[in-house]
Amino acid sequence: MKKVQKTLAMLLAAMMLLALAACGGPAPAPTEPPPADTSGDTPPADDGVVVPEEGASLKLWFDNDNYNEKIVELWNAKYPDIPLTVENVGTTDSRTKIELDGPTGMGADVFVQAHDGVAISAQSGNILEIDLFSDEIRSEFVENAINAVSYDGKIYAFPLSMKTIVMFYNKALVDTPVDTWAEMKEFAAEFNDPAQNKFACLWQAVEPYYAHGFLGGYGYDLFGPTHDDPDQLGWDSAEAAEGLAFYKTLQEDVYPVASADATWDAMNTMFSSGAAPYVITGPWSIADFTNAGIDFGIAPLPKMDNGVRPKTLSTVDTVCVSAYTQYPKAAMLLAQFIATDPDCLQLLYETRNELSASIEGQKLDFYANDPFMSSIAVAVNDALPQPYIPEMSNVWAPYQKAVIAVWDGLQTPEEALAAASEEFYSSLVVTE
């Protein structure tokens, strides 16, 4: 019996040695690693550095020739091995152009568009999620701009610049700008001479982008309190009607012209010639007025009869990466470069008079020392970010019809807004 036990013990010991040898034996021969994923979904390296694809070359669409020429020089200085070409394509045209040119391989890798196109482009699959830099965008840009480039909880663009409308005044004609529309009406009663085409204040009066603030200032919430619910258009609200009714008084007492005459050209010509004391426009007019030699200032829009200033819409220009790019990492690096590099932001300021959407960018000396940009920054922070849901594109046409009908005295605010609301919801059914 003892002999059997001894034999079993020896067998068990041998088996244990074999098992240990198997565990501690040489590793299997290495296999070929899988190819690197170069798609836009690839996370950055552990050190946070995004490495562009080998052999990358890029195309950018933007709408300013002076900017386009110099941005290539700045890019080449930092990324000499990634050729960049730039084509002049408008920010209002780039979304539809990428839909056509992207699938053919003729589109840009990176393009700039207004933020109301971001949700549409994301929904239709024409732009990439900026997943490589989403944390950076959420922490380094102003909140309104972050919301403007977000869709379904994801980031789809770099915010570039922020804009809204303000009141410009000619210092040769105005000592101290008015602070209320009641004061403006008193000034207009003395200044206006329609026969001589003299008006106290001019603006693109029947463009909803300009008119909306007066409705917003009376408490109207476009698409509800969070501005993202297409079922809460709100044109049937008392606040919307009250705001539009006040707006009509400006046609009667400040700018008594037909809607067809309240144009950009009229505003720009009269102020640039020194004939108009006040105009309502945005930072895009600074260069024209400066080149015209006008000594002007910028002030907030006057308070309405309820003691509140118009709640204007702010817009954000955004830098998007095409879903059709062959080089998503390089393209995202270009988008980041355009939106955050101090030299690029200075170029944006010098060529377009635009305010950066970057928190640190707004602190750069050339912004901080410019009183016009400081005024724009205050106005932008007080403005309502233009709703960024796809249904926003269905708002403009009926909204303008309502404003024109009231401005020209063809309908009451309630009638005009009811007709506009019906057209809006009918258009959603068609697009679905």
Enumerate the language-model features and the residues they cover:
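A structural signal for short loop-to-beta-strand junctions that line the ligand-binding cleft
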Residues: 100-101, 108-109, 137-171, 199-203, ...
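Extracytoplasmic "Venus flytrap"/periplasmic binding protein-like
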Residues: 74-141, 150, 154-156, 172-179, ...
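Long, aromatic- and glycine/proline-rich binding clefts that accommodate carbohydrate-like moieties
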Residues: 52, 148, 299, 349-401, ...
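Conserved N-terminal structural module of periplasmic/extracytoplasmic solute-binding proteins
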Residues: 9, 20-119, 135, 305-307, ...
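Hinge/lid segment of periplasmic solute-binding proteins
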Residues: 43-49, 114-166, 176-187, 193-196, ...
